[in-house]
Amino acid sequence: AVAVNSPFFPPDLYDADPETVLSDCWMENRVPVFESVLNPDGDPKVTFPEDIDSIDEALQRIADDETVVPTLLERGDRFDDRFEHFRHKHGSFWRWVRPVFDGPTRESANARIEFRPLPCQPTVRDTIALQAVFAGLLESLPRREHPIYNQPWADARENFYAAVRDGLDAELRWITADGTETTDTEELYAELFELARDGLELRGLDAEEANRYIQPLRERVDRRVTPASWKHERVAEAVGRGEPFAQAVWGMQAEYIDKQTETLIEGTFVDWL
């Protein structure tokens, strides 16, 4: 929700009037576009994944997934070439969160989880902030045995699509550390950032370092603004002044690039505000 960054397509792709586009657009269009283009009839391949309870189940999910590009592969010299056809299927196992098993040598063989919906960010520091928050959460949540692990799958799925659709305006369901269910976004984000800070400290950062990494995203929440909402507001204001929709979108994009150029390395997105 704090990272959304793609509310518009190129303006010549729209048939609807500007008011409809502005009211109906998703804040992160990459997710619905990928799903609509690549999902075949029947079981979807690009989707929020079902729960997985074991490594065996994760392996079986990939093995059972519909094959899109059948290929005969020659075995190479890598360790994971022993299961080259299974590894090849990773390339079309399109879940927004997915397991990956590989490794060029036995010593480097690994199982990892890819969290794939994170969009690109306007600056380097914003990108690092997003990675830091996720790294901190992945460290803190299991160590603290946080009750969000008990959230029903249906709620997690709805949270995902609500965040993609509405950004910071999404109504999200959260379970606090004391087990209380809430939709209070102020409480949700406050606890989320504290858990991220805790996780970074558990990995060896001091409190000042951890807070510095997290701060760009914390400020977005405090100011109720994301890159997507910034883009949406710019286009809406231009259309409100009477500009043609296409001119409004291209003008917004030009301003985005100018500000990104000014802040790419040393600044953050909130410096634009």
Question: Where in the sequence are the language-model features?
Answer:
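Acidic, glycine-enriched catalytic cores built around paired aspartates
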Residues: F9, K89-R95, P99-A111, L118-L273
